[in-house]
Amino acid sequence: MLESHNDTAVAIAEHLGGSVSGFAAKMNQKAKLLGMSSTHFITPNGLDANGHYSTASDMCKLASYAIKNKDFLSLVQTKSHSFSDCSGKYHYSLTNHDAFLSYYEGALGIKTGFTGKAGYCFVGAAKKNGITLTSCVLASGWPPNKSFKWSDTKSLMDYGFFYFQKTPLPVQNLALAKIPVKDGKKKFVSLKPIIPKETLTASFDSLKIVYRIPTALCAPIRKNTPIGSISFYINNKLFQKTEVFPSESIEKSCFSDTIEQVLNQWMDIFCLS
């Protein structure tokens, strides 16, 4: 990682995937899980190849996922590392080529890249005031303009930290809702409360929340089975969907339950009279 050693990436790919193509298949499977819909990997080191492509947006998704791993985050923040071979006879020193670590306050990394077709590239991350942002610049100049990627990334980060802030999602208190239950041992069921989360928004963003919750349910009801959802849209684009669950399970009523309900109703009438 520190020296961008392409041969090592191939060796790791062959060890973990059995072959480069086998490892690429694992990479593509993971990319799909992360929502990287415009990415297809062929090489493990990012070198140019037919059918090997991605986008800045997808690289940011990958970066956001990767920096949640403490070992990975520690690695990309390492500026240099020295080690010896197994015999202790030979010593080696590695230097991180990520100048962004020293160039930008709050920088976390992450990785540089260059090919003749892609130009200078950089996936970056930075943290300020409890907010972590990721960025990606592709084709940010060609030789001799090696430093363009640093200034371009700085501009992106400055923009992000200036305009975006943490915003709590205004979710209604679902615990107050009572959903009628047909043919159940109970007539109503409440909903599990949803803890409001935060997201990054700018003052010019529009937030829309769509509740899809039924007006009535039929027994049986299982508390671990979702009965609705809440969708959150920023600028009319879905960015998060949360499932809604009942607070308890309710079994379907039987004949004896019906008789008991009728008797209770008669007792209530008798007491009132």
Language model feature labels by segment:
Residues 1-4:
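Short helix- or helix-capping micro-motifs
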Residues 7-8:
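Mid-bilayer segments of alpha-helical transmembrane spans in multi-pass integral membrane proteins
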Residues 36-37, 51-53, 57-58, 63-273:
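Domain-terminus/edge residues, biased toward the C-terminal soluble/receptor-binding domains
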Residues 13-67:
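Mid-domain, small-residue-enriched loop/turn segments at the edges of structured enzyme/sensor domains
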